[in-house]
C-alpha cells in the first residue's frame, strides 16, 4: 500500500537538512530522557520524515508502550495520534488508520477540520479507511 508520492523520505535538500538537524537535537533529548514518550514520539516523526521507517516504527511503538492511554488518557491519546502520523508518513496506511481510529476518541485527538485540512494527513487522502474516519467526525448538518 506504499506509494512514493504519499510517503515522506524523498525530501528536498533544504528540508532534509532541517529534519536531520532536528533529529540530532531530538536524539539528544531522548538520550537525556529515555522514558519520555513525547520526546520519543517526536523522534519517530522526524525519522518518518527522513524515510527511516524501521526506526520511526520502533520509536513510535515504544512511545505508546511508555505512555498507554489507560495510564494517561490525554497524553497517551496524543501518542496514539503521533503513531498514526508515523504510519501515514512511512506509507503504512493500516497502522495509520488503526491508530487514528483510536486517537480520535480522545480529547487530544485530531478534529474533523484538522484531518480534512492539515497536510500532515495528505498521505492518507483517498484511503477509504481514512475517509471513513474523517466522515465520522463531520459536523451534523443544521
Named regions from a protein language model:
Residues 1-142:
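Alpha-helical protein-protein interaction modules
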Amino acid at each position: 500500500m506504499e506509494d512514493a508520492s504519499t510517503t515522506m523520505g524523498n525530501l528536498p535538500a533544504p528540508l532534509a537538512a532541517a529534519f536531520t538537524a532536528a533529529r540530532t537535537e531530538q536524539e539528544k533529548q531522548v538520550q537525556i530522557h529515555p522514558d519520555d514518550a513525547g520526546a520519543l514520539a517526536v523522534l519517530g516523526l522526524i525519522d518518518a520524515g527522513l524515510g527511516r521507517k524501521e526506526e520511526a516504527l520502533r520509536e513510535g511503538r515504544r512511545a505508546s508502550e511508555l505512555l498507554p492511554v489507560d495510564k494517561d488518557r490525554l497524553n497517551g491519546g496524543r501518542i496514539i495520534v503521533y503513531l498514526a502520523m508515523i504510519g501515514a508518513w512511512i506509507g503504512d496506511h493500516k497502522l495509520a488508520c488503526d491508530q487514528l481510529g483510536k486517537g480520535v476518541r480522545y480529547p487530544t485527538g485530531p478534529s474533523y477540520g484538522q484531518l480534512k485540512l492539515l497536510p500532515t494527513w495528505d498521505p492518507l487522502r483517498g484511503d477509504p479507511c481514512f475517509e471513513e474516519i474523517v466522515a465520522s467526525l463531520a459536523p451534523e448538518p443544521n
